[in-house]
Amino acid sequence: MKISNFSKTAFYAFLLSGNFVFFTAVAQTQLENPALKIYRATPAKINDLVNTKLDVRFNYAKHYLYGKEWVTLKPHFYPTDSLTLDAKGMDINQISIVKNGKNVPLKFLYDSLKLRINLDKKYSSAENYTVYLSYTAKPDQLKAMGSAAISDAKGLYFINSDGADKTKPIQIWTQGETESSSAWFPTIDHPSQKTLEEISMTVPSKYVTLSNGKLVSQKPAGNGLRTDTWKMDKPHSPYLFMMAVGDFKIYKDKW
């Protein structure tokens, strides 16, 4: 069947008018919502998270977390001899590169928000390396603004830690979305990063712990304490790291 020039012209005119209506609608939406005009770029990737291992204890009176961390990374593409981690409002005690089972100290700069670490050499994208950090997180002293949905961004919450309010349970829990996990452990705190996870929590023996993945061990830690280790073997974003400690009840079922 032969299509006339008139039909072709009408068809193209229809397409053009449809595109015009679409672009007009988009432009109108942007005028109505100025937030849509903001260009939200993904941060450049210099290093990729591979695995994050944490060993944490809590000071209920001061609302502190005492942490040890072994974070394994690799350069994203280009070789690099430096590493930048998000770490909000912490005391940084030690940073080392793990070499043959030994910790070799590294030089670093810290401005209360970012850790800039000089590695021991330049690593290629085919090489993994592990950095050890010893730190204290102080979430209640962190002055960070949240969003309309979540009014603050301190990441780690101590609930009725002294037991003074008899109507509230004593609990600890985290809320990391979208970039608040770096208030309780140093990391590259962006949803585009993905890492495996292992968390060991030392808590009073009377409490139950919750975290990502599977509970792989529970060991007495002396003085009425117990260390629980949770392990997640699926890569996930840092904001999904989760801890909860409290007088929870455990229910088990099979199906």
Functional labels for PLM-detected ranges:
Residues 26-255:
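Acidic/His-enriched low-complexity segments
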Residues 1-32:
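Bacterial Sec-dependent N-terminal signal peptides
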